[in-house]
Amino acid sequence: MNTSTSGKCPVMHGSMTTAERSVTEWWPNALNLDILHQHDTKPNPMGKDFDYREELKKLDVAALKKDLQALMTDSQDWWPADWGHYGGLMIRMAWHSAGSYRLFDGRGGGGTGNQRFAPLNSWPDNGNLDKARRLLWPIKKKYGNKLSWADLYILAGNVAYESMGLKTFGFAFGREDIWHPEKDVYWGSEKEWLAESVLRYANEEDPESLEAPLGAVHMGLIYVNPQGRDGKPDPLKSAHDVRVTFKRMAMNDEETAALTAGGHTVGKAHGNGLESNLSAPPEAADIEEQGFGWVNHKTRGVGRDTVTSGLEGAWTSKPTTFDMGYFDMLFGHEWELKKSPAGAWQWQPIDIKEEDMPVDVEDPSIRRMPIMTDADMAMKVDPIYREICERFRKDPEYFKDTFARAWFKLTHRDMGPKVRYVGPEVPAEDLIWQDPIPAGNTSYDVGAVKAKIAASGLSVSELVSTAWDSARTYRGSDMRGGANGARIRLAPQKDWVGNEPERLKKVLSMLEPIAKATGASLADVIVLAGNVGVEQAAKAAGFDIAVPFAPGRGDASAEQTDAESFEALEPLADAYRNFLKRDYELPPEELMLDRTQLMGLTGPEMTVLVGGMRVMGTNHGGTRHGVFTDREGALTNDFFVNLTDMGNSWVKNGGHYDVRDRKTGKTKWTATRVDLVFGSNSILRAYSEVYAQDDAKEKFVKDFVAAWTKVMNADRFDLKK
């Protein structure tokens, strides 16, 4: 027997799951469509028919909260609770789950249970939160499919606060779990954790120059460095960083101060040991660790000897009670810089009495020095934060209410409108950051509205473009935007360059009287106008088709609209209308994928929509780029037929491309990068070829209508209840 190959891997082609180069590594500049496929049903073990909202109806919320209350004080030997209470740990887990949200693109946040997966499960700032998740496993195991991890993380934080004396503002279930890491979230370009901040600031002296859409000063942090940016203590500089990072999470100064104080009223920081003694984070842990990271195999490493952030100590005298102790500690003492046992910078009081110190987490006969982070000291040295905190200190009830509301906002900001909330503790009060929309009318004559629109004299391009502009703001990351509410008629949307204000004003002046005369909301009329335009274009192509429509959208008022927060939804690029506000570092086709992913569309849906929008003449400003047809206004597959025709050649001409006849050299059309990518990228070309086929004319129309309807209804959560 020949044993020369003994010990070699029997799979001769090697491993495609570890070190082998992927397609994108071989060709790094190739357009990667993975973000459009990341939440396919294939990796989801629940199956296509699973309905979490239906499962929630079976959940015994009172029993669940009772179990969570019991968990808080059920200390486990493998990870003992500080002072016998897991509240601080659970709050940090919930906070860091929700706190990754950023306003710019709505990504991050606690709405998906993403903390279970890389990179978040192994971020330096999330150290030892794997222990919190494992402590929750018996409860998740007990309640099964009736309770998502995403809901459990946030509820555990809520119950932790309640168990320590805070009256919370409320809680909503409804967060659905994802089943693999998110590929669409840009966390930064750095290649190492906690890399120097110069890599994400255009100007280190200007906190506002933090790279968009990022919301943290370093790679691997939720907000700011507790020791000061780049580990250099400077409370005033930290104040600026805190202000910018919390603003990027849609928090104002008062909410920021309340969250900082309320978050550090309970629990402690851990740094009584050496970070070098810790093992790898969960994603890199040895297989026998079973997903446990930061394990200390060299010393005791738990209880009072835990190392997490490197800072060591509690902020208050009673770290398991929600009281006013944070303000008393911060403003009642002078502070000096010291190094923790782990070598981290922290602030300690100069003149504190022993009886005002918190007790040791294991031995109540021992007193320990309290601490403040650089961000805590910012609350004292920044004049705006100080004034707010002193106001809180004088009015405890106001502080508790402000914090409870800010905590609710923090933990629910990415859930979208209130109609998505489920459960017995949903607050009755409507909050402006929920983008409230009044109920719409469903009893009007839809046919009569469509007839009036058709008789208005508005063109297919005007009808379709306006409806598209109204709906395209939807983003599935935080469920904001969309056609419902007709906020396209309000500031700031009515003035966005991408919405062509003059054209928009003209179209709305024609549609508003129709809404008034028929009893329909303007939001419904705008969508119906787009549907009429699509139906007219389909008819011009030889197909009679009715675009599905569901009435019931409402019209939001200016008072119900936080104009500043809606600025983040402005489309700076929209490939569907061949619009680019200005040149960006990223190529237009990458921006197209980003918007497509936010809208919840697939690669084929993106393809059919772009092709249809081009032939209907919906380009921003009426440009001719990509209008590969002689029948503009008809919903034909001409875009794809001519894109894939080898009788044409494509020649760069300044900022665009000429489509020329190969034989004569005559320019037939012009195009942009987002037009040509559908013939250049191998995957998109495969989709384009499907729609270019001779037998695809009807399929193209039907697929366009289906994708169009998906966009128009993306924010109709009332239809999905």
Swiss-Prot record:
Keywords associated with the record: Heme, Hydrogen peroxide, Iron, Metal-binding, Oxidoreductase, Peroxidase
Record's subunit section: Homodimer or homotetramer.
Family of this protein: Belongs to the peroxidase family. Peroxidase/catalase subfamily.
PTMs per UniProt: Formation of the three residue Trp-Tyr-Met cross-link is important for the catalase, but not the peroxidase activity of the enzyme.
Cofactor or coenzyme needed: heme b
Gene name as annotated: katG
Protein name: Catalase-peroxidase
Pfam families documented for this protein: peroxidase (PF00141)
Positions of heme b binding: H264
